């Protein structure tokens, strides 16, 4: 899937670049556990796709280099986004740019989506700031939503 500044490849566990991104994200996240078990998360997404076409896990490429993970999935009648940028590419505003472009693309591709949701742990200050920067509004201590324009 093409975005303005990124290319998204559907996650393939046989692709070494894809596996490397997931391993880097899980290793960087061991302390805070913001992303959780990504392999399990991806399995759940693939199972949910059988019932709803809006369930996908992607590896994001920037300048042809894999820099992160982003997914859309349905949970409790809402459309959730989960994302992560590998440690060595953080602090470059790639997360904000990726989230903004991905959100716009999801509204374009899936007209049934009325709003998107992020679940962000209270201790994840960087993601909370990023969500607000991209136009997500805080609903409670962990939930942020963005409505279709």
PLM regions and their residue ranges:
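Conserved N-terminal entry element of GNAT/NAT acetyltransferase domains
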Residues: 1-27, 149
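C-terminal "cap" of GNAT-fold acetyltransferases
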Residues: 3-6, 133, 137-149
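Short alpha-helical
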Residues: 16, 76, 125-126
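Alpha-helical elements of Rossmann-like donor-binding domains used by nucleotide-donor carbohydrate transfer enzymes
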Residues: 20-24, 40, 97, 101, ...
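Acetyl-CoA-dependent GNAT
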Residues: 28-82, 88
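A conserved beta-turn-beta hairpin within the catalytic core of GNAT-like acetyltransferases
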Residues: 73-83, 90, 109-114, 142-145
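Conserved acetyl-CoA-binding loop-helix of GNAT-fold acetyltransferases
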Residues: 91-106, 129-133
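Conserved beta-strand-loop-alpha-helix junction that forms the acyl-donor binding cleft
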Residues: 116-128, 137
């Amino acid at each position: 899937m093409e975005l303005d500044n990124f290319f998204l490849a559907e996650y393939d566990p046989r692709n070494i670049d894809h596996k490397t991104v997931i391993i880097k994200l899980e290793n960087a996240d061991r302390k805070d556990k913001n992303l959780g078990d990504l392999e399990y998360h991806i399995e759940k997404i693939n199972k949910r796709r059988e019932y709803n076409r809006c369930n996908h896990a992607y590896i994001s490429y920037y300048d042809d280099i894999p820099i992160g993970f982003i997914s859309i999935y349905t949970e409790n009648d809402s459309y959730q986004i989960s994302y992560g940028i590998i440690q060595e590419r953080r602090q470059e505003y790639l997360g904000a740019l990726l989230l903004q472009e991905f959100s716009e693309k999801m509204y374009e591709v899936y007209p049934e989506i009325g709003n998107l949701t992020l679940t962000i742990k209270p201790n994840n200050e960087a993601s909370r700031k990023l969500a607000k920067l991209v136009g997500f509004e805080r609903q409670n201590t962990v939930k942020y939503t963005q409505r279709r324009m």
